[in-house]
Amino acid sequence: MNFITGLVSVSFRPLSAEEIIKITKNAGLDAIEWGGDLHVPAGDLDAARAVAEKTRAAGLLMPEYGSYYRLGVSAPEEIDGVAACARALETDTVRVWAFHKGSLNVTEEEYLRAVADAKRICAAYPDLRFCTECHNNTLTDDYRANLRLIEDVAMENFGAFWQPNQYRSHAYNLESARALAPYTNALHVFAWEGNEKYPLAFHRDRWKEYLDIFAEKARAENVNLMLEFMHDNDPKSLGETARTLRSFIENV
């Protein structure tokens, strides 16, 4: 099973890159998704190279870059700085955001602008895979809208990240996982219900079902399981949370 465990660096924005590397290594995780807002700002190649060198020296992977490029919203030239940082990190996967409105609030012109932008960046950087954040108040706020976007972009290097929607039912999230699994190579892992955050073990049964769905993909290629925003926002809890995540994988 090719599940890669890791940490999303924005989970602990106050920490330095060096501190992020240390706690990730100490927790026994495999990888870090570096965020493009603080630890590796888009276009800052010096920062990207320095962070990449330190991450590799610690024996950690960098399977994805968490950019804040918004399809159809960001200035078109901003993708160049994003792509440059991804290459400096030697990752082939870049997280992007799908517009700045929910799927039911967007106009057709706005939607088509986001689709055209996705096509543009995928064509400009065929060596990179661009994956949308699965998030409310974007075009991926519902898995059916997410599928429509993937189908309308229709580029081989365009896909999705997945995470459970904390404001929807478990049944909905299972439907979402089944629908998006073929297009997904990274998951953001947490245990939330609405605005309440819980220890990851609280959703052990739910994550067993989610990982069973993504297991088929993980038999053929790497699927990244990236811990995001711990229940207590305390770096000291990362080790326990990482052990919980590994126990999930052992039972798939």
Per-region residue spans from a language model:
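A short helix->loop->beta-strand "cap" motif at the edges of active sites that frequently abuts
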Residues: 60, 91-92, 128, 216-224
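N-terminal pre-domain/capping segments
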Residues: 1-93, 155, 159, 182-184, ...
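Active-site groove signature of glycoside hydrolases
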Residues: 91-106, 126-136
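Acidic-and-aromatic substrate-binding clefts and catalytic sites of carbohydrate-active enzymes
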Residues: 10-17, 35-47, 69-77, 101-106, ...
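Acidic/histidine-rich catalytic cores of soluble enzymes
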Residues: 5, 31-32, 65, 122-207
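Conserved active-site loop/cleft motifs that coordinate metal ions or position small ligands
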Residues: 186, 222-230
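P-loop/Walker A phosphate-binding loop and immediately adjacent motor/lid segment at beta-alpha junctions
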Residues: 200-225
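Active-site cleft segment of glycoside hydrolase catalytic domains centered on the general acid/base Glu
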Residues: 103-118
